[in-house]
């Protein structure tokens, strides 16, 4: 056989292999040929850094927590509380919150069990509070939990929480999942341990949620099966494979070849191609995820707000959003979700390199013969760090580097894998970084005290900007001391105006979350807050 006919036959074979498979009949309906009934395959660019939510930092850990744990309340797709392990959401109106706002009563469902058959009830909730506050446990955050004066176990199904002061955002901290909200962990397994930092549970937990972990193939996948004791009954899936695929191009390839059924948080440059795929549905929603260039304000070259504002005005953020990020997201001006009742009337800093140069001149940073700025012998140079899994992140860093150089600022790119960047002993939480170009996520309540107050600088909190400002510290705290939304809104507007003035971060965009899912998947209802896996027990395929 000559070479040309052989190549022609090979080409015909490859074309046939790559062609979309025809739907397969299943009873009275049709399903895609690649669908594995009852088995959902999720692709993730990250691997959980811990399966104990108290120690977890990344989005993958938040996803998996929604499979493994049943919090007192879940957030629905609109950010509203939905009773889960608790039977009702406490309010002033229903008496669950006392008139003085300092006592909250939680009622647990009867008959709930952990996946090992042990009872799951208020005792686990009380133990969880003690675990969060245990000084031997290096938990991620204590925000909200440290406002509790005492917890009283009235009976196994009733817990009375007494607060040191009113905290309007505390329900999300104590009873939600995500942010500083930790679901209860099992007292019967963990209460005798002096510290949970190295507990085997952190990598091999039992479950109170709809699924149990059957195997963790580190670096490859986490496998889940239904929890036989889940209080809602058997979930609709028989198996979930949560596959670790760090590269966005590989994720695209695997949804294209139908080796995965869900590709969440799609990279912006891939959305157009994904919309052309047969048997794949694209969902879109505004998420509570926001990208920022956050500064370490404790660094001497970044301690002056004029320098930080010059960086904000010296980079064409709108151009980057339109081009590098393909215009799929919404420009940000603050860290309050645009749809929130507390969203402030603030506009982003404009692109104005001439104004940026004037600010740097006024701050005493002079231009040398090489065109770069220095002050008292110290060069105006800093580094930026991101997670390089998404190509657009690195492209944006390069663009910042080029534009800041025209102002006389040297920017070094120093990137890390997610698990290193956000580790407790990693660069961000130890302050060994200059700036971070990363995604942060919000809860439904606009409380952001833990992000900006000097009371919550690590290791006691998550103010990783190291910003110290009495107005922000006082105002963010005062906003938690009332349940009156009008008063809270006024306080948050004042706080956000101050943040805008001091520029501890350049707020870049609010993420429109895109997901590519197998069109056979039923029950997929992506959420604004925390995780799209919030209702996994409802899924069918």
Each predicted region: which residue ranges?
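Gly/Pro-rich hinge or "lid" segments in bacterial periplasmic/extracellular proteins
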Residues: 76-80, 177-235, 239, 249, ...
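Aromatic- and charge-enriched surface segment that lines or borders ligand/interaction sites
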Residues: 89-138, 160, 254, 301-303
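C-terminal motif of bacterial Sec signal peptides marking the signal peptidase cleavage site
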Residues: 15-17
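N-terminal lobe/hinge region of extracytoplasmic solute-binding protein
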Residues: 43-97, 130, 204-208
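Alpha-helical secondary-structure segments
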Residues: 41, 121-128, 156-162, 166, ...
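Surface-exposed binding/hinge segments that line
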Residues: 142-191
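Detector for C-terminal structural segments
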Residues: 22, 217-221, 226, 291, ...
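Ligand-site clamp/hinge motif
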Residues: 199-202, 227-273, 396-402, 409-419
């Amino acid at each position: 056989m000559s070479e040309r006919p052989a190549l022609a036959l090979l080409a015909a074979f490859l074309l046939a292999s790559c062609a979309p498979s025809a739907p397969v009949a299943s009873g009275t309906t049709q399903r895609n040929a690649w669908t594995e009934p009852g088995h959902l395959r999720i692709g993730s660019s990250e691997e959980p850094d811990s399966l104990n939510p108290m120690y977890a930092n990344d989005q993958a850990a938040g996803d998996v927590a929604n499979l493994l744990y049943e919090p007192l309340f879940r957030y629905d797709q609109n950010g509203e509380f939905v009773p889960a392990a608790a039977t009702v959401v406490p309010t002033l109106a229903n008496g669950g919150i006392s008139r003085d706002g300092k006592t909250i009563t939680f009622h647990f469902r009867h008959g709930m069990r952990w996946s090992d058959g042990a009872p799951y009830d208020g005792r686990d909730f009380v133990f969880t509070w003690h675990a969060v506050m245990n000084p031997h446990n290096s938990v991620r955050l204590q925000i909200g939990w440290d406002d509790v004066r005492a917890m009283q176990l009235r009976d196994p199904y009733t817990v009375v929480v007494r607060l040191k002061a009113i905290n309007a955002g505390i329900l999300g901290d104590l009873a939600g999942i995500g942010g500083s909200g930790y679901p209860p962990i099992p007292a019967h397994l963990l209460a005798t341990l002096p510290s949970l930092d190295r507990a085997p549970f952190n990598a091999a937990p039992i479950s109170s949620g709809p699924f149990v972990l059957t195997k963790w193939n580190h670096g490859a996948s986490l496998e889940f099966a239904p929890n036989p004791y889940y209080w809602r009954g058997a979930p609709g899936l028989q198996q979930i494979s949560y596959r670790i695929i760090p590269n966005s191009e590989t994720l695209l390839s695997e949804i294209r070849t139908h080796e995965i059924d869900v590709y969440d948080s799609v990279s912006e440059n891939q959305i157009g191609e994904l919309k052309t795929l047969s048997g794949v549905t694209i969902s879109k929603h505004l998420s509570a995820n926001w990208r920022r260039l956050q500064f370490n304000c404790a660094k001497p070259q970044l301690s002056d707000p004029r320098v930080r504002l010059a960086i904000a005005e010296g980079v064409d953020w709108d151009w980057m959003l339109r081009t590098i990020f393909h215009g799929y997201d919404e420009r940000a001006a603050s860290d309050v979700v645009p749809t929130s009742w507390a969203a402030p009337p603030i506009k982003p800093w404009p692109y104005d390199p001439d104004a940026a140069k004037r600010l740097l001149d006024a701050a005493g940073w002079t231009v040398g013969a090489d065109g770069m700025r220095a002050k008292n012998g110290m060069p105006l140079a800093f580094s930026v760090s991101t997670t390089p899994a998404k190509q657009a992140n690195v492209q944006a860093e390069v663009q910042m580097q080029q534009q800041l150089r025209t102002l006389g600022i040297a920017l070094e790119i120093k990137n890390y894998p997610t698990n290193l960047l956000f580790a407790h002993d990693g660069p961000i939480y130890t302050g060994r970084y200059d700036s971070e170009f990363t995604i942060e996520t919000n809860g439904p309540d606009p409380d952001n005290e833990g992000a900006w107050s000097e009371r919550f600088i690590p290791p006691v909190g998550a103010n990783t900007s190291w910003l110290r400002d009495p107005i922000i510290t006082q105002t963010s705290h005062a906003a938690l001391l009332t349940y009156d939304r009008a008063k809270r809104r006024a306080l948050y507007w004042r706080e956000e105006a101050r943040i805008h003035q001091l520029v501890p971060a350049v707020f870049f965009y609010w993420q429109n979350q895109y997901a590519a899912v197998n069109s056979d998947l039923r029950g997929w209802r992506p959420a604004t807050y925390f995780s799209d896996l919030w209702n996994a027990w409802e899924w069918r395929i």
